[in-house]
């Protein structure tokens, strides 16, 4: 089947769309277009803003005129995404809180929050298709694919901007729980080590401790000690990529079943005893100021069955 956007047309940027990256704006506006095609037409200059070429990092300004060229795409009807009743039920069961401004979910481990790196549809893309009545849906923050827990989605652009401002000003408080290898010492309460994002052939994003990196601070509290493991509560003061996982590895208390920053030989016992392969890191709660209700909101996400089963049966 061939789908066509048959003629050149222009979009004028309003207040609801300003400050977005052009690639994200186009992905939300033209949901049928594959993201790699969006990147290509930007890169080749087919997308113009105010008659000028731009790159995909360009942030839209109020009043910008975006030129959209004619586009033809081939689609295989057998490969259409099937968002059936079962998937709708799965997403509905994730809901922790919802009002006219926010949708807050308990994200399962193993589910990507957005497309990219070989994933055509993440949670946010699926939600936009499942919920056409929500004119605007966007991620306030991100969680790693393997991390479970609280995920906030904004229903209005103005709400997204407000929450991003709260994040920048460190007014949003997040707490995580993790099962780590080793018996955690009572005196260890925090770590402050700079983190630098690098790349390698095997992994696109690898984060390491480096003096050239950004300031990164994480606080810890013990929840429960086991014979060879500890369940800890974690409060990241800064919000760097993979911050918790890298800091814990540096302290020699890696998270159980962390495929990227863990230690496989330590994971062997739990992996085989419980027949699991998920990172035991969970975004337990988030506390933020609701800009419309004018009060603080605390959202808590319960652990899933797998995580609870491991804790229940550990000695």
Curated annotation (Swiss-Prot):
Keyword line: Isomerase, RNA-binding, rRNA processing
Pfam families assigned: PseudoU_synth_2 (PF00849)
Gene Ontology terms: biological process: enzyme-directed rRNA pseudouridine synthesis
Keyword Isomerase attributed: yes
EC numbers for this chain: 5.4.99.24
Protein origin, superkingdom: Bacteria
Catalytic activity entry: uridine(955/2504/2580) in 23S rRNA = pseudouridine(955/2504/2580) in 23S rRNA
Active-site residues (renumbered): 144
Enzyme class, UniProt record, top EC level: isomerase
Gene Ontology molecular-function annotations: 23S rRNA pseudouridine(955/2504/2580) synthase activity; RNA binding
Stretches assigned to the S4 RNA-binding domain: 20-90
UniProt similarity note: Belongs to the pseudouridine synthase RluA family.
Role this protein plays: Responsible for synthesis of pseudouridine from uracil at positions 955, 2504 and 2580 in 23S ribosomal RNA.
Protein name, as recorded: Ribosomal large subunit pseudouridine synthase C
Organism taxonomic ancestry: Bacteria, Pseudomonadati, Pseudomonadota, Gammaproteobacteria, Enterobacterales
